[in-house]
């Protein structure tokens, strides 16, 4: 969450962007205060870009941002997740259908990301609490590029739930398919594959 001072800066930046729809400064402020947040509010970003003039919208950065927003909207809460599959450590392809009739929390992480390690600690608590719940499952998708480091992190952090990685880093297909912008991230799915929540806290889960 934003601190009071950060919130005030964001409000000023938003006011400037909305009142200066043709200024290059608006692009800078949009990037600095909204796009670069750990969990961007894409609905707000879309609203602000809609106020921009055609000249700004034709700029490569804004054009790419609009494409990103379009991808994000495809995987917003209430939408059905697209088909994704990745191998686990044994080489078996894992997908949402591997967790049939279960609520599924997909967690995106990497061994090189300190915040992912903190998230793994929270997930261990959730797993311990829900381990016997036959209607709930966890699936970790890693952005590691080194198999040894990935396997060592799984062992070190005692990640007993299903784990997948294709060692492509940020180029792994689910990252683009699911519009993941930062780590750690998560998606909470209903048994039918509908997205019920995104980037949920331990308390919310």
Positions of PLM-derived features:
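Oxidative protein folding and maturation machinery
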Residues: 1-94, 101, 118, 129-132
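Generic structural signal for well-ordered beta-strand positions
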Residues: 94-95, 196
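Conserved redox-active cysteine motifs that mediate thiol-disulfide chemistry
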Residues: 100-101, 108-128
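Alpha/beta-hydrolase fold active-site loops
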Residues: 103-104, 184
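Hydrophobic beta-strand anchors of alpha/beta hydrolase catalytic cores
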Residues: 105-106, 138
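C-terminal structured domains
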Residues: 116, 126, 141, 172, ...
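Conserved segment of the thioredoxin-like fold in thiol-based oxidoreductases
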Residues: 131-170, 180-183
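Thiol/disulfide oxidoreductase modules built on the thioredoxin-like
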Residues: 159, 166-205
């Amino acid at each position: 969450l934003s601190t009071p001072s950060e919130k005030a800066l964001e409000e000023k930046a938003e006011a400037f962007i909305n009142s200066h729809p043709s200024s290059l400064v608006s692009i800078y402020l949009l990037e600095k205060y909204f796009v670069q947040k750990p969990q961007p509010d894409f609905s707000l970003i879309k609203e602000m870009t809609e106020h921009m003039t055609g000249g700004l919208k034709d700029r490569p950065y804004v054009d790419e941002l609009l494409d990103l927003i379009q991808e994000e909207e495809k995987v917003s809460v209430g939408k059905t997740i697209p088909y994704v599959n990745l191998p686990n450590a044994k080489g078996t392809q894992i997908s949402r259908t591997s967790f049939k009739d279960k609520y599924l929390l997909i967690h995106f992480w990497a061994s090189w990301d300190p915040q992912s390690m903190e998230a793994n600690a929270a997930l261990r608590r959730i797993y311990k609490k829900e381990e016997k719940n036959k209607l709930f499952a966890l699936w970790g998708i890693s952005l590691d590029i080194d198999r040894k480091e990935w396997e060592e992190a799984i062992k070190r952090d005692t990640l007993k739930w299903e784990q997948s990685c294709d060692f492509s880093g940020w180029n792994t297909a689910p990252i683009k398919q699911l519009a993941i912008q930062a780590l750690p991230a998560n998606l909470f799915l209903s048994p039918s594959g509908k997205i019920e929540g995104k980037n949920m806290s331990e308390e919310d889960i």
